[in-house]
A protein has these predicted regions:
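Surface-exposed peri-terminal alpha-helical interaction modules
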Residues: 2-310
Length: 310
């Protein structure tokens, strides 16, 4: 049976007394990295001249300096960390949606499917993140709510990028970020480009499916509007559900994305309802009512409405 040391089993675990002794011997000598590494045993390097490469590469010191709560309420830490985790996941989802969109524009369906699958895995983690706030009570939330003033998730430009990629576009939604030029530039780029769904419809058109012309070339800065002609085009795709039909696989992959988006919105609604009920939102919206309307807004609408007639 093959055996490994605990340090070999997991890079985050201590290597034990033997590795500690190796580090002591190395520091007593010239401190050479080769001595601490003990390559003949396969042990980890335990001596570094400054911050460890792990801390340096991942920016751990910077990352862990960002959780600056403004009150003594313990629940604020969970709230702040969850918010920051979600922002990081927004970046990952956006990167994969953009990669999938670009692959569709290049007629590379396998690459698009890979990007969408990767995005769904990130979306699952994103949705699970709401569980970190599942036990926060209204009383706990009220103890730190005033500390963030008018701050609101509505102001997240990371989330706004996702909405633009989904086709939910509005130039007015760039306005809150007008003082941040790089953010404005990035949002404008996404506003003016085809969305993920637009790219899918353009692919269907190139494959000879009856996508209406005004959904193949249009003003990309406008929010997507559903069309019966698009539903008919998807109906032709669903008429052939064999595994070899890459357009059918694409349709279902898009539904996987859409379902997770809907779930995230619903989880957001439930979290707000549980912690603050129907009180006005911190960003000026009517809170619960605004979120409820957002939940009802279908992503990739014809893929949903099609199910009424199949």
């Amino acid at each position: 049976m093959l055996t490994t040391t605990s340090a070999q089993q997991c890079p985050f675990m201590s290597g034990g007394e033997e590795e500690g002794a190796a580090a002591t011997r190395a520091s007593a000598g010239d401190g050479a990295q080769e001595q601490a590494a003990r390559p003949e045993r396969g042990g980890p390097t335990l001596s570094f001249g400054g911050a460890t490469p792990y801390v340096d590469y991942a920016g751990i010191d910077t990352l862990l300096d960002l959780q600056r709560t403004r009150t003594d309420e313990p629940a604020e830490s969970a709230f702040l960390i969850t918010t920051q985790v979600m922002e990081l996941l927004f970046v990952l989802v956006r990167e994969r949606w953009e990669a999938a969109r670009d692959a569709l524009e290049a007629d590379d369906v396998p690459a698009a499917l890979a990007g969408l699958r990767g995005a769904c895995r990130a979306q699952d983690v994103l949705n699970d993140s709401w569980g970190l706030l599942g036990d926060m009570t209204p009383t706990q939330f009220n103890r730190f709510r005033a500390s963030f003033g008018e701050a609101s998730g509505f102001q997240s430009y990371g989330y706004r990028k996702l909405e633009f990629l989904l086709g939910n576009k509005s130039a007015a939604m760039i306005r809150p970020h007008k003082a941040m030029e790089p953010v404005v530039d990035e949002l404008t780029r996404l506003l003016e480009a085809p969305s993920l769904y637009d790219a899918a419809l353009r692919l269907l058109h190139r494959r000879g499916l009856p996508v209406p012309a005004d959904h193949v070339e249009r003003d990309w800065t406008r929010a997507y509007e559903p069309d019966p002609g698009v539903e008919r085009a998807w109906a032709e795709v669903y008429a052939d559900d064999r595994p070899g039909n890459d357009l059918y696989l694409l349709a279902e992959a898009l539904m996987d994305v859409a379902e997770r988006v809907t779930r995230w919105r619903h989880l957001h609604l439930v979290a707000v309802k549980r912690t603050m009920g129907g009180k006005p939102g911190s960003g000026g919206s009517n809170g619960l009512n605004w979120l409820a309307r957002h939940v009802e807004q279908d992503v990739f609408p014809e893929l949903w409405s099609l199910r009424n007639t199949i």
